Design a protein with these regions (language model features):
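Long, charge-rich, low-complexity alpha-helical segments
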Residues: 36-83
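Hydrophobic packing positions characteristic
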Residues: 1-15
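Short, Lys/Arg-enriched anionic-surface-contact patches
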Residues: 17-38, 81-82
């Protein structure tokens, strides 16, 4: 279900993700999980780096279901970009 980047940074356009928001002046206006200060890209980078969902959840204090939803969005977007 989820894709791990193979030596490459996963680039995601979070603008259509329902659980991500951009708040000017909050975390420098980067995409964050709604209601948090956790950067969406940080979750993906941790996963791409080999961290399991349970570990990411514990480290960031975000429910595993939310982590999976975020990673699923990123994977679907990446699959649309693949030739």
């Amino acid at each position: 279900m989820f894709m791990r980047a193979q030596g490459k940074k996963t680039v995601v356009d979070w603008s259509d993700c329902p659980i991500v928001e951009v708040v000017p002046g909050k975390v420098s206006g980067v995409p964050i999980l709604k209601g948090t200060r956790v950067q969406a890209d940080s979750i993906v980078e941790n996963f791409d780096g080999g961290s399991p969902v349970a570990e990411i959840s514990a480290n960031f204090g975000i429910p595993e279901t939310t982590i999976r939803e975020l990673l699923g969005f990123a994977a679907r977007q990446q699959s649309r970009l693949q030739p």
